[in-house]
């Protein structure tokens, strides 16, 4: 593949699906802050004037679901009926039940180290050295654009913006290296009074130019800013939102494979989440160690069983040492049992709400982004 294009998209914290993700993770955080061993699977549905929170929770904690929901919506910025959604007046329905004891008997063990996986499934982790944070550039810059949109909206710099927004960036590659940006799409909800030309100019000057590196922009780069011309009706009034519907935005923007399991609202006993974080941690440390330029890890689990049923390492021909050495390094230096990866990544803490917008990976504040194993792996491989 000599020359090619690759595109990824992101959505803002005010996108309906992301509202749902953030509510689910806010509930999770509130519960595990009181009860770190709680079992939580929290799903959220949002539509005009309504939020429904459901799922299965087994815990000794008590949390105020309604207040958590309203505060989350308020922080995002839906605070007036003019936006089609209002934190203070929306209905909040709570339909949470308990997790099945059939699951508990497979997960909970006398020795915590023998804790079984909360479900079967496959999970992928990925890293590439095309950016300093070892993430693919298209998803990285798509996230940065909508994050900047929220920043200038909340600061009042562009006070005509509203919470809902989407971005999309197409990168040009030659021999696997970035040579430029081919296209940029940014659509943002706005108030009715701003004109389309004024909005487009403001978005270009205050969002796009400060975020995208100038050396990747050229005269042939295409910009599509609110291409329909009008985006007043947005958020839950424009579309209903559901937890777990932005799994590619949450991960690698399509640059790596995905096992299908969503993250938000799930406690760390759910390997859909915790093992995907661990797989990223492993892949990132392999690349940081210089063992490969690109790395994808696949893990699989059986419900109630501690050890992974399989571990796969793919380096796409970019490995600097024998493939067998990389695999052995993974087996000797990472505990990928559910209990082991929870301990390794310190997952039993209330850090999940902040993961629920702008991507779960490539953000240094999260423990699975540490490269503390890189030196150990490099030494193991003789690099």
Curated annotation (Swiss-Prot):
Cofactor field: Mg(2+); K(+)
Gene Ontology CC entries for this record: cytoplasm
Annotated GO biological process: one-carbon metabolic process; S-adenosylmethionine biosynthetic process
SUPFAM superfamilies in alphabetical order: S-adenosylmethionine synthetase
GO terms of molecular function: ATP binding; magnesium ion binding; methionine adenosyltransferase activity
Disulfide bridge partners, by residue number: none
Keyword Ion transport applies: no
Keyword Nucleus annotated: no
Pathway membership, UniProt: Amino-acid biosynthesis; S-adenosyl-L-methionine biosynthesis; S-adenosyl-L-methionine from L-methionine: step 1/1
Binding-site residues for L-methionine, renumbered to this chain: 56, 99, 239, 270
Flexible loop as annotated region, ranges: 99-109
Subcellular location: Cytoplasm
Catalytic activity: L-methionine + ATP + H2O = S-adenosyl-L-methionine + phosphate + diphosphate
Binding-site list for K(+): 43
Cofactor comment text: Binds 2 divalent ions per subunit. Binds 1 potassium ion per subunit.
Self-association state and partner proteins as the record states: Homotetramer; dimer of dimers.
Protein family: Belongs to the AdoMet synthase family.
Stored PANTHER family: S-ADENOSYLMETHIONINE SYNTHETASE
HAMAP family named among the record's database cross-references: S_AdoMet_synth1 (MF_00086)
Name the UniProt record assigns to this protein: S-adenosylmethionine synthase
Source organism of this protein record: Vibrio atlanticus (strain LGP32) (Vibrio splendidus (strain Mel32))
Upper lineage: Bacteria, Pseudomonadati, Pseudomonadota, Gammaproteobacteria, Vibrionales
Gene: metK
